[in-house]
């Protein structure tokens, strides 16, 4: 019987834990958001480089005779085409890449807002961040100390 009451106590404790988020859960959520933001930024930077490459190739091919042979990598296979065939496809790809970059930029801005709201909601301070506002809150008294207990993330 003592074992059953011990188990009931543990399960009710874990139920209470679901209502209040622990510091580890807050840090994990914050790090997840930061990682998602980094992923979006990385993908946007990669597409920017690809866009620059497309622009360079398009500019070069515009100066060349349309009947000249050129080679294009399609699905890992090098295909022989003419400039006349390749140029419209490259320009179309460039436009699509620009649209994707715009979408990623909007997603990146939205993720930044979400990250800032999460920081404010959970009172998250990054290491090395200015700690003067926290010092002012702590000097106000014990009540302020309890409410300003935030999470420090490295």
Curated annotation (Swiss-Prot):
Family: Belongs to the prefoldin subunit beta family.
Compositional bias ranges of the Low complexity kind: 140-154
Region (Disordered): 124-154
GO BP terms: chaperone-mediated protein folding; negative regulation of amyloid fibril formation; positive regulation of cytoskeleton organization; protein folding; protein stabilization
Location, primary (coarse class): nucleus
Subcellular location: Nucleus; Cytoplasm; Mitochondrion
Family annotation (PANTHER family): PREFOLDIN SUBUNIT 2
Alphabetic keyword roster: Chaperone, Cytoplasm, Mitochondrion, Nucleus
Record's GO cellular component terms: cytoplasm; cytosol; mitochondrion; nucleoplasm; nucleus; prefoldin complex; protein folding chaperone complex; RPAP3/R2TP/prefoldin-like complex
Function: Binds specifically to cytosolic chaperonin (c-CPN) and transfers target proteins to it. Binds to nascent polypeptide chain and promotes folding in an environment in which there are many competing pathways for nonnative proteins.
Pfam families assigned to the protein according to its UniProt record, in alphabetical order: Prefoldin_2 (PF01920)
Oligomeric and partner information: Heterohexamer of two PFD-alpha type and four PFD-beta type subunits. Component of the PAQosome complex which is responsible for the biogenesis of several protein complexes and which consists of R2TP complex members RUVBL1, RUVBL2, RPAP3 and PIH1D1, URI complex members PFDN2, PFDN6, PDRG1, UXT and URI1 as well as ASDURF, POLR2E and DNAAF10/WDR92. Interacts with URI1; the interaction is phosphorylation-dependent and occurs in a growth-dependent manner.
Superkingdom: Eukaryota
Protein name according to UniProt: Prefoldin subunit 2
Phylogenetic classification of the source organism: Eukaryota, Metazoa, Chordata, Craniata, Vertebrata
GO molecular function per UniProt: amyloid-beta binding; protein folding chaperone; unfolded protein binding
Composition bias type Basic and acidic residues, residue spans: 124-139
